[in-house]
């Protein structure tokens, strides 16, 4: 029978740690007799990272459970828990809802609550089902769409799992990512849920991960914890570059092994080398992105979270137009029924559009969820970004890690840092180095109330403000006399001694502006004659001194 329990987070996860009772069917694990519990002598693993290993036949195993069996257990468990939850009346989320753990046993022969299946017996646990139902509703995900995306077709395993050794699955419609997480990360997420709930209520538009469910598959005395999140990188869009950025420089370069992959994940030092000028966004988009990053970092800092990254994939639209189209690699959507409703605020563009709307202009062109940008070559880009790896708190282990690293290296360059400093450095790197505002071009028709003063210098080169006159495109054309002199007159009044440059700074080699236009009569002004100007200055000086 399905059972539910509630209690503190630690108590909730203590049930996760307990293995299946000895002698029960669950102790035999998910794998059938045709699959060995561990690597056999004939099939030895050729690659192992953390709990994840791949044998010579290409079969992935996680905690002695094959990937195919794990995918089947996940789909059976989610189908049951979402279906049973739909029969319960909707209500407001209560505090105790964040600590509820529901458990259901799946014997291979089936039961009055579960269907028969061809895997070994396993137990499936669901954490905070009512709270996560609210999160899914907040993002516009209906129960039938959630089930259809995750359970109608086999999950697709992603080979590029990263250095953590986690398993990654993506739903067949590209909507959701399923990731295996460690016990401490799952425990931290459960403790984080009340604050996460409050933050999403205040602002659902965020670059933070969007969590849709937290589950555990218990088999063979092992607990495999998984989290369902939004998918940042659609497979329907070809990515040309991918970066994992922290704002740190210590060991922040992709390894040679990583570079050999089809789409390597580069790091901070690689970005500084590949794109030293940064990525250029229009003013409204840049402002919206930086405000979103600032708000998200403040939330992470309040929870003492650090060591997170900005995952950024770049689609080069100009390169894509020149590349031959391959039907084999192009993603084709499932056409058996209309595409399910997309999760709200699930793309990078949607995550920052709330800020862009407050600022005024919003990019309305369809960019497939990416943020439009350009590189220093002027090539059109689409950026797919999101903050990842937030389930790390600044605990004793991290403090100790930073302490010994700081003794050997510059403390400011180490990625494991106190949350406040980490957030500040992260924002500074993203908004000053990675993303930059496209400089506005000066408009030749823009009018100013008054031009710059004639006495101002343009720089160390000694150019007079006549060069500034040409840049502003405006200057009052007036012929003045001694009787018309006013103390506050600026340009066009060479008879005002305090505002004239020293004579020794003016040379015949000084640049002279081209024709400008008078805002009064709209006629071209005559090019200034430097010799005539000097003569007028001499006359004015003699008149004021006598």
Swiss-Prot record:
EC number annotated for this UniProt entry:
2.7.1.68
Recorded catalytic reaction(s): these are:
a 1,2-diacyl-sn-glycero-3-phospho-(1D-myo-inositol 4-phosphate) + ATP = a 1,2-diacyl-sn-glycero-3-phospho-(1D-myo-inositol-4,5-bisphosphate) + ADP + H(+); 1-octadecanoyl-2-(5Z,8Z,11Z,14Z)-eicosatetraenoyl-sn-glycero-3-phospho-1D-myo-inositol 4-phosphate + ATP = 1-octadecanoyl-2-(5Z,8Z,11Z,14Z)-eicosatetraenoyl-sn-glycero-3-phospho-1D-myo-inositol 4,5-bisphosphate + ADP + H(+); 1,2-dihexadecanoyl-sn-glycero-3-phospho-(1D-myo-inositol-4-phosphate) + ATP = 1,2-dihexadecanoyl-sn-glycero-3-phospho-(1D-myo-inositol-4,5-bisphosphate) + ADP + H(+); 1-octadecanoyl-2-(9Z)-octadecenoyl-sn-glycero-3-phospho-1D-myo-inositol 4-phosphate + ATP = 1-octadecanoyl-2-(9Z)-octadecenoyl-sn-glycero-3-phospho-1D-myo-inositol 4,5-bisphosphate + ADP + H(+)
GO terms, molecular function: 1-phosphatidylinositol-4-phosphate 5-kinase activity; ATP binding; kinase binding
Q: Which InterPro entries match?
A: PInositol-4-P-4/5-kinase_C_sf, PInositol-4-P-4/5-kinase_core, PInositol-4-P-5-kinase_N, PInositol-4/5-P-5/4-kinase
The cross-link Glycyl lysine isopeptide (Lys-Gly) (interchain with G-Cter in ubiquitin) sits at 88
What are the record's GO terms for cellular component? cytosol; lamellipodium; mRNA cleavage and polyadenylation specificity factor complex; nuclear speck; nucleus; plasma membrane; ruffle membrane
What does its activity-regulation comment describe?
Activated by phosphatidic acid.
Give tissue specificity per the record: Highest expression in brain. Also detected in skeletal muscle, testis, brain and lung.
Superkingdom of the organism of origin:
Eukaryota
Which class of enzymes does this protein belong to?
transferase
What biological processes does GO assign it?
A: actin cytoskeleton organization; activation of GTPase activity; cell chemotaxis; fibroblast migration; focal adhesion assembly; phosphatidylinositol biosynthetic process; phosphatidylinositol metabolic process; protein localization to plasma membrane
Annotated segments matching region Disordered: 442-475, 491-518
Q: Which UniProt keywords apply?
A: ATP-binding, Cell membrane, Cell projection, Cytoplasm, Isopeptide bond, Kinase, Lipid metabolism, Membrane, Nucleotide-binding, Nucleus, Transferase, Ubl conjugation
Where is it located?
Cell membrane; Cytoplasm; Nucleus; Nucleus speckle
Where is each PIPK domain found? 66-434
Null phenotype? Answer: Survive to adulthood, but bred poorly and display reduced fertility. Failed to form any vessel occlusion after chemical-induced carotid injury. Platelets have defective aggregation. Bone marrow-derived macrophages are defective in actin polymerization during phagocytosis. PIP5K1A and PIP5K1C double mutant mice are embryonic lethal.
Q: Which regions are flagged for Low complexity bias?
A: 450-462, 509-518
Chain's role: Catalyzes the phosphorylation of phosphatidylinositol 4-phosphate (PtdIns(4)P/PI4P) to form phosphatidylinositol 4,5-bisphosphate (PtdIns(4,5)P2/PIP2), a lipid second messenger that regulates several cellular processes such as signal transduction, vesicle trafficking, actin cytoskeleton dynamics, cell adhesion, and cell motility. PtdIns(4,5)P2 can directly act as a second messenger or can be utilized as a precursor to generate other second messengers: inositol 1,4,5-trisphosphate (IP3), diacylglycerol (DAG) or phosphatidylinositol-3,4,5-trisphosphate (PtdIns(3,4,5)P3/PIP3).
Quaternary arrangement and interactors, per the entry? Answer: Interacts with RAC1. Interacts with TUT1. Forms a complex with CDH1/E-cadherin, CTNNB1/beta-catenin and CTNND1 at the plasma membrane upon calcium stimulation. Found in a ternary complex with IRS1 and DGKZ in the absence of insulin stimulation. Interacts with DGKZ. Interacts with PIP4K2C; the interaction inhibits PIP5K1A kinase activity.
This chain's protein is named Phosphatidylinositol 4-phosphate 5-kinase type-1 alpha
Source species, please? Mus musculus
């Amino acid at each position: 029978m399905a059972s539910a329990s509630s209690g503190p987070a630690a108590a909730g996860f203590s049930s996760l740690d307990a293995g299946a009772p000895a002698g029960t069917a669950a102790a035999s694990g998910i794998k059938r007799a045709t699959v060995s519990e561990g690597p056999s002598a004939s099939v030895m693993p050729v690659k192992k990272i953390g709990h994840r290993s791949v044998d010579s036949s290409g079969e992935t195993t996680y905690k002695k459970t094959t990937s195919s069996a794990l995918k089947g257990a996940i789909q059976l468990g989610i189908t049951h828990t979402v279906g049973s939850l739909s029969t319960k009346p909707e209500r407001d989320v209560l505090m105790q809802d964040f600590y509820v753990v529901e458990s259901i046993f799946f014997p291979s022969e089936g039961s009055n609550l579960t269907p028969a299946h061809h895997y070994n017996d396993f137990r499936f646990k669901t954490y905070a089902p009512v709270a996560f139902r609210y999160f899914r509703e907040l993002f516009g995900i209906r129960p039938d769409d959630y089930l259809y995306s995750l359970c109608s077709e086999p999950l697709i395993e992603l080979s590029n799992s990263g250095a953590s050794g986690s398993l990654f699955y993506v739903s067949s419609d590209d909507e959701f990512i399923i990731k295996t997480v460690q016990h401490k990360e799952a425990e931290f997420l459960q403790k984080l849920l009340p604050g996460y709930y409050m933050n999403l209520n205040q602002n659902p538009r965020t670059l933070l991960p969007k969590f849709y469910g937290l589950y555990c598959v218990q088999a063979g005395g092992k607990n495999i914890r998984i989290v369902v999140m939004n998918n940042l990188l659609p497979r329907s869009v070809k990515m040309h570059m991918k970066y994992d950025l922290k704002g740190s420089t210590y060991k922040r370069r992709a390894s040679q092994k990583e570079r050999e992959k089809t789409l390597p994940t580069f790091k901070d030092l690689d970005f500084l080398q590949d794109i030293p000028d940064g990525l250029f966004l229009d003013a409204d988009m840049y402002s919206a992105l930086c405000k979103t990053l600032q708000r998200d970092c403040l939330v992470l800092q309040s929870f003492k979270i650090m060591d997170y990254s900005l995952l950024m994939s770049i689609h080069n639209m100009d390169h894509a137009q020149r590349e031959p189209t391959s039907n084999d690699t192009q993603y084709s959507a499932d056409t058996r029924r209309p595409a399910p409703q997309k999760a709200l605020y699930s793309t990078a563009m949607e995550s920052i559009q709330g800020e862009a709307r407050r600022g005024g202009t919003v990019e309305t062109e369809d960019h497939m969820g990416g943020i439009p940008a350009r590189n220093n070559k002027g090539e059109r880009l689409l950026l797919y970004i999101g903050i990842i790896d937030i389930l790390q708190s600044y605990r004793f282990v991290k403090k100790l890690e930073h302490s010994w690293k700081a003794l050997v290296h510059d403390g400011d360059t180490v990625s494991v840092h106190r949350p406040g400093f980490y957030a500040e450095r992260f924002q500074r790197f993203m908004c000053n180095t990675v993303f930059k505002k496209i400089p506005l071009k000066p408009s030749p028709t823009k009018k100013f109330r008054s031009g710059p003063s004639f006495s101002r210098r343009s720089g160390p080169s000694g150019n007079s403000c006549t060069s500034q006159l040409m840049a502003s495109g405006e200057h009052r054309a007036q012929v003045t006399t001694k009787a018309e002199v006013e103390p506050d007159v600026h340009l066009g009044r060479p008879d005002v001694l305090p505002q004239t440059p020293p004579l020794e700074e003016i040379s015949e080699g000084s640049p002279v502006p081209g024709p400008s236009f008078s805002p009064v009569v709209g006629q071209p002004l005559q090019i200034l004659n430097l010799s005539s100007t000097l003569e007028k200055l001499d006359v004015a000086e003699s008149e004021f001194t006598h």
